[in-house]
A protein has these predicted regions:
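Extracellular adhesion/carbohydrate-binding repeat motifs centered on closely spaced tryptophans
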Residues: 1-195
């Protein structure tokens, strides 16, 4: 007969990691917004206030400078950029600042750079600034064309009096000879089709 009692596991129990997890931003248990000659700040019910940190108040995230004043506009934190509107609330999704559009991650609020798929449309956000690209963009060794709306173009595009063809799979500009449909086309090194 088989003994149904399991044998003890000889593997020692893992030791806990001595590094504590980072503390989450405090969630205020009541408080009020106060304005003075410098700006807005938030006072907790116990009289303390957040300073030099991001705090969730209600349904929005706010950032406070080292003195405790609410921040607005672009804020850099831990190598990432965030945008806070005039109310101080952290923005997410598409934001227009000046003449440029930016995209802020919906979950974290961080500014996105590089390729972004929003719905069914691809966009390119410049690596240095995060601004949405329009017109010609070079990424790696390939060229792409972004519409005035920022959307990645594919197929035939006419720009500056010349025709170009952008891959329907990747959007990359064609150079050299390619079959498109049932016809052979040749594109010079600049991607221009010379008809």
């Amino acid at each position: 007969s088989v003994d149904p009692t399991p044998a003890p596991d000889p593997t020692p129990a893992p030791t806990p990691d001595p590094t504590p997890a980072p503390a989450p931003a405090p969630v205020p248990q009541g408080g009020q917004w106060i304005s003075d000659s410098v700006g807005w700040w938030y006072r907790y019910a116990d009289g303390s206030y957040p300073a030099g940190q991001a705090v969730r108040i209600g349904n929005s995230t706010y950032r406070f400078d080292a003195r405790g004043y609410m921040r607005t506009g672009w804020v850099s934190e831990d190598g990432a950029w965030f945008y806070h509107d005039a109310s101080g609330a952290q923005a997410s999704g598409w934001v227009k600042d000046g003449s440029s559009w930016y995209y802020l991650d919906a979950a974290t609020g961080r500014m996105v750079t590089g390729w972004l798929l929003d719905g069914l449309t691809w966009y390119y956000l410049m690596p240095g600034s995060g601004a949405m690209a329009t017109g010609w963009v070079k990424d790696g060794s390939s060229w792409y064309f972004m519409a005035p709306s920022g959307a990645l173009m594919t197929g035939w595009v006419k720009d500056g009096g010349f025709w170009y063809y952008l891959s329907t799979d990747s959007g990359a500009m064609y150079t050299g000879g390619h079959w498109i449909g049932w016809k052979w086309y040749y594109f010079n090194e600049s991607g221009q089709w010379n008809g």
